[in-house]
């Protein structure tokens, strides 16, 4: 992280650029949470801080709005922003200097579980649409409804099995987090963060296929759901990071 905040009297002076500042394009957005380096000589997990920055502060600039799969996600929006000698009161510091990583880690476990819950919900919607399309009497090919064609029976069955597996894994991770905390539940949380979005993506893709061209149009929510779930494989850590965490946990069981 290159963005910095330097204490100058009673104010922090902030400099840096930020990509994917979610919500910055919304006219209702009035304040930003800025994570930056305040203590570069501290141990690596104690170098960063979070500071509140009002949007109208001098030196805050939206460079461009970012597109996701070709969409600008207006009015919510994700911004590329630049901060040039932005001054804010030192009271805008959250929790304390060097505690930004601590704040971030505190929400990552619950946040990842929440992501997975939404992924399971998206999968359920896609499966429902797939089934309804499959038995629609107005959608017939070769004298049969669509569910009876190709491998659609298998796709429907696999989707239910995978959804249930994702749900039970997520419930297990949530229960463990509630009883023993984020750190002890880290492997279970990492597992679901990989599994649930990938399951949702597969089911949405199957639903798109049975809908044909309609599946990628504005007539169903499937295309936007697919884009959202694909970004979820990057949000709060990409799949590869979580797989690495799971593998390290498993290997650790057998290392002295």
Residue ranges of each PLM-predicted region?
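Flexible, small-/acidic-enriched active-site or ligand-binding loops
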Residues: 58-87
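Short, charged helix-to-loop "capping" segments that act as catalytic/coupling loops
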Residues: 22-36, 64-75, 132-149, 179-184
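Cytochrome P450 core scaffold surrounding the K-helix E-X-X-R motif
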Residues: 62, 92-97
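Short, glycine-/Ser/Thr-/acidic-enriched flexible segments
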Residues: 19-20, 26-27, 38-41, 56-58, ...
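Beta-sandwich/jelly-roll carbohydrate-recognition scaffolds of carbohydrate-active enzymes
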Residues: 2-4
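Alpha-helical interface subdomain recognition
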Residues: 7-12, 80-85, 99, 106-256
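Short alpha-helix boundary/capping segments
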Residues: 24-28, 43, 70-75, 108-118
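A short core secondary-structure module
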Residues: 10-11, 15-63
């Amino acid at each position: 992280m290159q963005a910095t905040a330097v204490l100058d009297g009673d104010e922090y002076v902030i400099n840096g650029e930020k990509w994917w500042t979610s919500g910055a394009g919304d006219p209702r957005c009035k304040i930003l949470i800025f994570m930056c380096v305040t203590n570069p000589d501290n141990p690596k997990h104690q170098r960063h801080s979070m500071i509140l920055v009002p949007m109208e502060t001098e030196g805050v600039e939206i460079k461009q709005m970012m597109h996701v799969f070709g969409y600008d996600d207006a009015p919510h929006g994700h911004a590329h922003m630049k901060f040039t000698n932005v001054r804010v009161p030192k009271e805008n510091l959250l929790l304390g200097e060097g505690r930004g990583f601590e704040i971030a880690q505190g929400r990552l476990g619950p946040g990842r579980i929440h992501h997975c819950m939404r992924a399971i919900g998206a999968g359920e919607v896609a499966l429902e649409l797939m089934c309804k399309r499959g038995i629609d009497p107005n959608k017939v090919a070769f004298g049969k409804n669509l569910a009876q064609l190709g491998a659609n029976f298998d796709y429907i069955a696999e989707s239910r099995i995978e959804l249930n597996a994702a749900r039970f894994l997520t419930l297990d991770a949530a229960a463990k987090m509630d009883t023993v905390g984020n750190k002890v539940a880290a492997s279970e949380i990492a597992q679901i963060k990989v599994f649930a979005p990938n399951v949702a993506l597969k089911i949405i893709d199957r639903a798109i296929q049975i809908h044909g061209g309609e599946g990628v149009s504005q007539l169903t929510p499937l295309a936007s759901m697919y884009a959202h779930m694909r970004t979820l494989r990057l949000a709060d850590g990409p799949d590869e990071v979580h797989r690495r965490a799971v593998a390290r946990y498993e290997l650790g069981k057998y290392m002295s």
